Amino acid sequence: MLFLLLACHPPATDPTGVTPPELPPFPSAHWMDDAGVALPGDLPHAATPIPVELLNGRPGFSPVQTAVIAWEDPLDPASLPGLDDVGAPGSVQLWDLDAGAPVPCFAELDAFPDLRGELPRLLVRPLAPVPVGHRAAVVVTGALQTLSGPAEAPPWFAALQAGTPPTGWEEHQEGYTALFAELAALGVEDPILAFDWAVSDGTGRLRDVLAELSTPTAWSLTPRDTDGLPFTLAQYEGSFTSDSWLVDDKQFADPPARNGTAEAYLFVHIPASLEGAPPASAPVWVLGHGIFSTPESYLAEEDDPSNVLELADRAGAIVIATRWRGLTLPDAAVAAGVGFDFGTFPLLTDKLVQGVANTTALIRLAVEGDLLDDPVFQGLADRTTFRYYGISLGGIEGAVTLANTDLIEHGVLHVGGSSWSTMLERSTNWSPFEEFITSTIESPGERQLLYSISQLFWDPVDPALYGAELADRSVLWQAAMGDDQVSNLTTWSMARAAGARLVEPAILVPYGVETTTAPTTGPALTQFDPDLGDDDQDNRPSPKTLAHDAPRHWEGVTRQTLRFLDPSDPGHVEHFCGAAACTATNPGDPP
């Protein structure tokens, strides 16, 4: 059963018969008080209540917050602005009130197949972050249609428009009156629904950790058996000692405080091409692995499934790596536990903050510390040349990491995205976790509210919030069209956030993304089409097409990566598929 109305005011009957809605639009002023965000303690949950105390008091909501609306009549999905309508005025709009400008967005109805008798929630998704400190507003116009005709303003909203708020909502009338005036000044007249909220920075949890993070001084490495492993001279694994903020290896204290040290995983790969190489001649690459994976999945498989072994060999690059805590294979049980008990969400996101801290610590250990003096490196490492290469999760959290360090100047972010709460439902990886969540939170509407709230936990590790830091950086996003794990729409959102330019020839030009031609520099975006279908249009897990993985062995991808991460002349984006876009039938020619 849905919880009672929020913000300290239960539903009350107005003398005119108008009542506040059981679920006010989220986010909005109804979910805030004078101190900031004010989520109620009785949010839907399984065993563990949602830890709203970690969120309440924040000055505003996420820059990439999904709005959730419980419309009282069945809506016609054809009347909603979809992904093909981005940038055109539509029945549902998102506005940056401070800038006086629309924000790219789309709207959709929750497509979960078993709604248990509920009407699907109307979801409004930003496709670019709203600037921190600004106010955002969702506007629904008379162009919205129900299944039986034009949609009408909800009675509670019509009452506010008339200046006669429902009983219990008198304190909100002044804010709505001001909102109506702001919208009218922007040329938005007579909406059938409108609500606004403040936007604030959610990155402090990570920034505070990194501000205290020290450079590690201790590590250990032991040789790995590399028999039968191609492109390999030697490998080592072990750990390094890094600062930790996790209490009992679970989550952070409130507020977060450094909690001693812990051992972080360490992997070292030396390619066969370095046999007999001159001293101090090998660039050092930091590798970011994919979701529910490990560095070994990319560096210790004989079939080289992601082409990383061959790539490192052709680059003549030493590769070092650690794990993304929270979303690495050894932590998979944590993610599953969150699925069964959504109130434990910080167990996942705090670990991922720790994972970014560990990766940053590894970079510092290599660049500023003494790691490369270890005999396992055979004196081969060039201590002046560092690069980053991240795949999937490594492309997502790699963007966060690079935004927070200047020790690595050039990075390739392969099949990465942003906007975690929008991205996950569309991923083929989501299916098992959705089963866990639906077993404990049965209401689809309540789940959509929780998914949107979860973005507040994701914010510290969401690259969309670091677009300004990446806007002048030498980074390259490589997108696989129709990606079944990281929806393309979240990659385009990241490109807008960072001002990355799309390098043509390309498959399609996303709205609001500028184009350029090669050769160029970052921040940049390139596209590779495995011809395995288009990006899904609804919030359901993608079928497993392997589009996410397919381009990794293409020469067009490999040569572009090697060129961008070149040890002596890095940061140049080139196109290696001739006059046409790179596709499965035009994957690029070898040098």
Give the location of each predicted region:
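Cap/lid segment of the alpha/beta-hydrolase catalytic domain
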Residues: 248-263, 278-369, 375
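Acidic, low-complexity Ser/Thr/Gly/Pro-rich repeat segments typical of extracellular/periplasmic
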Residues: 17-243, 247
